[in-house]
Amino acid sequence: MTAGSSPRCTPTGPAGRAGNERGFHAVAIDARSPRFDGGIATRLDSIPFGVVVNSHGRRFYDEGEEIWPKRYAIWGRNIAQQPGQIAYSIWDAKAAGLFLPPMYGPAQASSIAGLAVTLGIGGRAVADTIAGFNASIRPGGTFDPGRLDDCATAGLTPPKSHWARPIDTPPYYGIAMRPGITFTYMGVAVTAQARVLRTDGTAFANVFAAGEIMSGNILSTGYLAGFGLTIGTVWGRIAGAEAARQARDG
């Protein structure tokens, strides 16, 4: 599991490192999830279809900045930068069914203020935030959850660039979220043949790496859905072929 420390050695000695030591793939997960090994089922995909507020009841990032496969992996970091490393996803009845249902049921209330109290945050602050959000939505947009639509806010900071609709239809739903780190963007350094490099830049003869352990060679500042599988598949094939060649030829 990822414990937050960079890989520093292999069974045969110190390994070189590659990547961004402050970078990581982190998603928004249900705050009720287990600390370790909760799995992808604890990820929350409601964010684009509502608003996200921090413990002060204020929005802090554009929930509709880009399509979800390009943005879901930044929300863990976004939440980690908020007070207490916690945030709250809020949506209304119109958004129900637009995203994968959460593993644990959301809080539910007939009013925004009531929902905020249930979630343990200030009801007045959240109600004011939602009212300001609703009032800022540009009229005339055509909502389309399958593309970057033209439903956006105007004059609001931060904006919501797409999928902005008034949150005005009860019941209202909400879930507390925390950052869930999947893997870091720092890993062991490898050659183009997937051989692990030592700290002096020379390659181990019989140590190979593929997947997240060496993702720092490729990822540094961002992530697109499927990159992890791609890195594991492509580099796994390379590493397997090279390991077989090493075993055969010595």
Which residues does each PLM region occupy?
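N-terminal leader/propeptide and maturation segments of large enzyme subunits in energy/redox metabolism
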Residues: 88-144
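Hydrophobic alpha-helical segments, especially N-terminal targeting/anchoring helices
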Residues: 53-54, 190, 197, 232
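A conserved FAD-binding loop/helix module that cradles the flavin
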Residues: 1-7, 204, 214-248
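Phosphate/diphosphate-binding loops
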Residues: 35-72
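Short, small/polar residue-rich loop motifs at catalytic or cofactor-binding pockets
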Residues: 45-47, 182-184, 225
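Gly/Pro-rich active-site capping loops and adjacent beta-alpha segments
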Residues: 58-85, 198, 204-219
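A glycine-rich dinucleotide-binding beta-alpha-beta segment and adjacent secondary-structure elements
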Residues: 125-217, 221
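Glycine-rich loop(s) and the adjacent beta-strand/alpha-helix scaffold that form part
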Residues: 1-30, 194, 229, 238
